[in-house]
C-alpha cells in the first residue's frame, strides 16, 4: 500500500526534526537533512502500518499548500510503502521499566511510547 503525507521539517541547532501534521505523535529527527528524510519515510511507514494493524484507519492527508511554515521550517511530501511492514508480522507487546519522571513527561506531552521505542531502536540499528 502506497501512501503520501505532508511533513514539516524544522531546523534547530544544525539538526532537523520532522512532524506529520495529520498523524499525531508521528515525528522523528536526524543529524542532517538527508538522514532526517530517511527517518521521516521510515516513521511514516511504521506509524501507518501500526494504525492499520490495530484496526484503525488512516485519515486523508492534508493538502500541502494549506500547511504554514516559518523561516526555519519547510513542508514537503513523504512517500511510503507499508506492504513490507504489514507482511512482516504483528506488533509484539514489550514490558519495560522507565523512570517515573520520564513516564510523567511522556503522558503530559501525549508521547506515543510504542512509536518512540520503535523509533529509538531503529535509529540505533541504522547507525
Labelled PLM ranges:
Residues 2-4, 45-109, 115-123, 127:
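Short, charged, surface-exposed hinge/linker loops at domain edges
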Residues 23, 41, 110:
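ATP/adenylate-binding site constellation spanning eukaryotic-like Ser/Thr protein kinases
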Residues 32, 112-113:
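Residues that mark the N-terminal boundary/hinge immediately upstream of a DNA-recognition element
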Residues 32-49:
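A short, charged, amphipathic alpha-helix used as a generic interaction element across diverse proteins
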Residues 21, 31, 108:
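Surface loops and adjacent helix of pleckstrin homology
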Amino acid at each position: 500500500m502506497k501512501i503520501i503525507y505532508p511533513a514539516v521539517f524544522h531546523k534547530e541547532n544544525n539538526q532537523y526534526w520532522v512532524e506529520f501534521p495529520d498523524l499525531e505523535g508521528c515525528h522523528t529527527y536526524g543529524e542532517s537533512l538527508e538522514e532526517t528524510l530517511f527517518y521521516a519515510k521510515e516513521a511514516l511507514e511504521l506509524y501507518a502500518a501500526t494504525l492499520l494493524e490495530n484496526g484503525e484507519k488512516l485519515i486523508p492527508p492534508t493538502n500541502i499548500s494549506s500547511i504554514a511554515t516559518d523561516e526555519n521550517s519547510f513542508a514537503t511530501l513523504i512517500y511510503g510503502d507499508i506492504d513490507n511492514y504489514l507482511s512482516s508480522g504483528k506488533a509484539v507487546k514489550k514490558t519495560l521499566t522507565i523512570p517515573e519522571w520520564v513516564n510523567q513527561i511522556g503522558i503530559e506531552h501525549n508521547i506515543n511510547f510504542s512509536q518512540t521505542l520503535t523509533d529509538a531502536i531503529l535509529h540505533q540499528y541504522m547507525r
